[in-house]
From Swiss-Prot:
Keywords per UniProt: Electron transport, Heme, Iron, Metal-binding, Photosynthesis, Thylakoid, Transport
PTM (free text): Binds 1 heme c group covalently per subunit.
Lineage of the organism: Bacteria, Bacillati, Cyanobacteriota, Cyanophyceae, Acaryochloridales
Coiled-coil ranges (or none): none
Entry GO CC: plasma membrane-derived thylakoid lumen
Keyword ATP-binding in annotation: no
Subunit and partners: Monomer.
PANTHER family according to UniProt: CYTOCHROME C6, CHLOROPLASTIC
Localization terms from the record: Cellular thylakoid lumen
Residues that, per the record, bind heme c: 14, 17-18, 58
Species this chain originates from: Parathermosynechococcus lividus
Protein name, entry field: Cytochrome c6
A GO BP annotation: photosynthesis
Any one GO MF annotation of this record: iron ion binding
InterPro entries, sorted: Cyt_c-like_dom, Cyt_c-like_dom_sf, Cyt_C6, Cyt_C_IC
């Protein structure tokens, strides 16, 4: 996966709600490592599925992002979560 591309995809499509790994809509459903583990979202496959299909207030991005963009952003989210969203 291309983490630099994932960062661009995140910035352009995800950061409005998930800036710095947070969640402005549902405060407990963050992209922080602990929350990803708690909610079973701590794998690329789980993140890819949610990005493709959406859930609750989160829209589906299948058809809006390519498979490659979705894979890259999933890898970026896991990488940032492992680093504590420190950049």
């Amino acid at each position: 996966a291309d983490l630099a591309n994932g960062a661009k995809v995140f910035s352009g499509n995800c950061a409005a709600c998930h800036m710095g790994g947070g969640n402005v809509v549902m405060a407990n459903k963050t992209l922080k490592k602990e929350a990803l583990e708690q909610f079973g979202m701590n794998s690329e496959d789980a993140i890819i599925y949610q990005v493709q299909h959406g859930k609750n207030a989160m829209p589906a991005f299948a058809g809006r992002l390519t498979d490659e963009q979705i894979q890259d952003v999933a890898a970026y989210v896991l990488d940032q979560a492992a680093k504590g969203w420190a950049g």
